[in-house]
Amino acid sequence: MKKKAMALTVAAMMAAAMITGCGQTAAPTVETAADTTVQTEESTADTESTAADTAAADGESYTIGISQFAEHGSLDNCRTGFLEGLKEAGIEEGVNLTVLFDNAQADTATASMISDNYVSQKVDLICAIATPSAMSAYNSCLDSDIPVIYTAVSDPVSAGLAKEDKTPEGNITGTADTLPVEAQLKMIREVLPDATKIGILYTTSEANSLSTIETYKELADDYGFEIVESGINTLADVDMAAADLAAKVDCISNLTDNTVVQGLQTVLAKASAAGIPVFGSEVEQVKNGCLAAEGIDYVALGKQTGAMAAKVLKGEAEASDMPYEACEGANLYINTEVASDLGITFPENYEADAAEVFETVTVE
């Protein structure tokens, strides 16, 4: 029996008919919140175009909806990778693929409106980026045969999207961005040998954050840490919560919490004022001013998701039969400018071992 991952709010249901801002046309690509231009390596571009041209010549074409919960680097990278994964499978935007894209701007009611709209337009597939959008898409598609492929969902089981054995709770599957918490704790201990308290800021309504914090708590003692958490409800809460948390801990470890990531510059400012570092959870956060991260490559995760979606679109597999997949391994990212500003010296092997070293802070 299908079950709802999250009850739709009354406001979302009343507003579903008002989603004129998400209205799409027959153009090959419709963008209402962000640019979905995808860049691929020149060495593979010709092969991918040929595959898509062949599919188009055979009369195969698809329309998909991409619902992204918030606008920040990791989710943008997921979307880029997702379209690259489809392209590598011969499904190319503007050739045999129409993409309807909408960004919920970190609002769950808007996410529900977006997925409801895609269902009314009878798209061939919905790609949901981040846990709240995935839960909304799942609910919207309960009474339809539209498959949902999600990405950047940290814990599909706690979100009600999958069973413990990774099999789907309906016509929905995708990829999980479960954070490498143990690798992160090990790295923090190496960088801050005298630290005892790690602060974590999270949104109380994000299931992915709640489950990740539990993992932190389970493992923290093994590395001599105490986890100090602070919950927020909206982006407006970040300023006060970050300042209060920074005064109590030796460092902050950032999650992939969508609301907190949107307020990352505020978190960084409060931490800097307190003289403590912020550790990120993926490459964009380190680029934007976090000290370091054992994190995930979200472009690669998106490509993995795109490959799964291509199988569903081509009729090679049913989403309801595909266990969700997880991103394997972690990459080390460091920012030497941040380290210098804080008077922190990385272990001598870090620059050589890092997947990427940022020498400056770049905020886009």
Please describe what each predicted stretch is.
Residues 5, 18-34, 38, 42-45:
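Bacterial lipoprotein signal-peptidase II cleavage site
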Residues 56-58, 155-197, 296-317:
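Hydrophobic alpha-helical segments within soluble ligand-binding/sensing domains
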Residues 62-89, 100-109, 205-209, 259-260:
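Extracytoplasmic "Venus flytrap"
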Residues 64, 82, 173-220, 322-339:
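An alpha-beta-alpha
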Residues 74-90, 183-184, 208-225, 266, ...:
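Short, solvent-exposed amphipathic alpha-helices that sit
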Residues 100-163, 257-272, 276-279:
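Beta-alpha junction/loop-to-helix N-cap segments that form part of ligand/metal-binding clefts
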Residues 207-282:
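Pocket-lining segment of extracytoplasmic ligand-binding domains
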Residues 311-364:
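Hinge/cleft segment of the Venus flytrap/periplasmic-binding protein
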